[in-house]
């Protein structure tokens, strides 16, 4: 079984991790992408794209950010893009039903972007 985690890098985490749960429930990291403080992570329905919010801003911006990833053959995340959240403190995200839009809830600014 594959699953994905966002980890606080300022506390020693590696960023976004792709993991596999194997025999005897042993967890194995299959890939990682360093982004500063990624938190909430979701995949699309086909599980070929992954999205996360980061408490840290994209370069040269204020507030948080969102990132998108493709998932390689083994499920490892590969960074596609990172954008400003247009809000502060992004904490949750969801895809529109047709998966054309990504919505972010911003805790600090109290906004949706």
Model-found features: residue ranges?
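A short loop-to-beta-strand structural motif that recurs across blades of beta-propeller domains
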Residues: 15-17, 64-67, 111-113
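Loop/turn position at the start of each blade in beta-propeller repeats
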Residues: 36-38, 88
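Short loop/turn segments immediately following beta-strands, especially the blade-tip
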Residues: 19-25, 69-76
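Residue-level detector of Asp-centered blade-edge/turn motifs that repeat once per structural unit
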Residues: 43-47, 97-99
